[in-house]
Amino acid sequence: MELADIRREYTKGGLRRKDLKADPIDQFNLWLEQAIKAGLTDPTAMTVATVDENGMPFQRIVLLKNVDKDGFVFYTNLGSRKAQHLEHNSNISLHFPWHPLERQVHITGVAEKLTAMENMKYFTSRPKDSQLAAIASKQSSRISARGVLEGKFLELKQKFAKGEIPMPTFWGGFRVKPQSIEFWQGGEHRLHDRFLFSQHDGEWDIDRLAP
């Protein structure tokens, strides 16, 4: 089969302005709740796009860990490629692809580092093995073999068999403060529904976009 022949119709219904909440964070939370209830695999998984100092874009899948009126939160190794990019350019884009619901959400904004207290609160809530993995992996660095990583993990597991695991200084989170949030709902005959929330002077404007 030719790739150009792979297609389907979008039949799960449209999206109208009257259906939208006035605040896009409330609308996002509604859609996220529906994605979770629908049993989607990894409903909190999002594509995170950053740009390096040469203007080259990079993307990767990261899990959303919190969302509130202040923005969208994720955690990472602060020496990772994404974190280094954000040091040079704090502009960022998030994308949630909820394919089974024929929905997408696209967010643009600016990333800010979380406080040490916020980082510690989440780190201590993680499973112990996840805490150890955060210490063992120098994210995005080159390693000779997987065995090196596994050996470091086992070494740390023995070292911290008892007691609390200290949060590494090279680990932390970012809060993405949104500047725009677009909601996309698939429609029949490729007449999809798109609504863009844009923030101006602390208020959200809503525009319908052509598909």
Swiss-Prot record:
The keyword Transmembrane helix does not apply. Pathway: Cofactor metabolism; pyridoxal 5'-phosphate salvage; pyridoxal 5'-phosphate from pyridoxamine 5'-phosphate: step 1/1; Cofactor metabolism; pyridoxal 5'-phosphate salvage; pyridoxal 5'-phosphate from pyridoxine 5'-phosphate: step 1/1. It comes from the Bacteria. FMN binds at residues 60-65, 75-76, 81-82, 104, 139-140, 184, 194. Disulfide bonds: none annotated. Binds 1 FMN per subunit. Keywords: Flavoprotein, FMN, Oxidoreductase, Pyridoxine biosynthesis. GO terms for biological process: pyridoxine biosynthetic process. InterPro entries: Pyridox_Oxase (IPR000659), Pyridox_Oxase_CS (IPR019740), Pyridox_Oxase_N (IPR011576), Pyridoxamine_oxidase_dimer_C (IPR019576), Split_barrel_FMN-bd (IPR012349). Catalyzes the oxidation of either pyridoxine 5'-phosphate (PNP) or pyridoxamine 5'-phosphate (PMP) into pyridoxal 5'-phosphate (PLP). Belongs to the pyridoxamine 5'-phosphate oxidase family. This is Pyridoxine/pyridoxamine 5'-phosphate oxidase. It comes from Vibrio parahaemolyticus serotype O3:K6 (strain RIMD 2210633). The gene is pdxH.
